[in-house]
Design a protein with these regions (language model features):
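Sec-type signal peptide cleavage vicinity
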Residues: 2-196
Length: 196
């Protein structure tokens, strides 16, 4: 009887330690959802998109193993919605992956998603400056109703290296690529003319 109780106690202890480990793993950075924070830069006489009116954008993410050089799509042209001030979340939940470096790029075209043959992202391309990767707009046309803003989320090193704790929000700073402008002309001439 004592032997049976001892085995039962040992089994409970082993099972408890296994479930405790699973709970600890959930707290790791690598299992946390990818979230975003944004800032919209002000352009001189910029159009409609401002920090307060900015409600959604679309994002590309590519990742690679730290030890490799080939980048792969983590997600492509995914809508990200503003939940509250400083709190943004993609429509689908994506998680950080251990030992992978991530690079991000995003855009907003008013309330409209652009087709993937118009906008694309390649994290392996480099440009001058602090950001890496290139967000490309090809054959983009506008009807004049929207501002086009774009931003890169690569100012920080988004690589999980085994640390525990809270995962950082991806910082996206958007800049106006094309802005809707309104021109007002004033004249002292009469509104109507007589033609003889």
């Amino acid at each position: 009887m004592r032997k049976g109780l001892f085995l039962l106690g040992a089994t409970v202890a082993v099972l408890s330690s296994c479930s405790n480990q699973e709970v600890m793993d959930v707290a790791d950075y690598a299992n946390q959802p990818i979230e975003f924070s944004t800032f919209v830069g002000k352009n001189t006489r910029a159009g409609d998109i401002t920090q307060t009116s900015f409600k959604k954008f679309w994002v590309f993410a590519q990742n690679k193993k730290v030890s490799e050089s080939d980048w792969h799509n983590a997600f492509t042209n995914v809508q990200v919605n503003k939940i509250s001030e400083g709190n943004w979340s993609p429509v689908n939940t994506y998680f950080w992956e251990a030992n992978k470096e991530f690079r991000f790029a995003g855009y907003a075209n008013g309330e409209s998603q652009l087709d993937e043959n118009i906008v694309s992202y390649d994290a392996s391309e480099t440009t001058t400056g602090t950001y890496t990767g290139v967000l490309t707009f090809k054959d983009y046309t506008t009807d004049g109703t929207n501002d086009l803003v774009a931003g890169m989320g690569n100012a920080n090193d988004y690589t999980w290296k085994g640390d525990a704790g809270e995962a950082p929000a991806v910082e996206m700073t958007f800049h106006h690529m094309l802005s809707k402008l309104t021109f007002t002309f004033k004249t002292k001439m009469a509104d109507t003319y007589d033609v003889d």
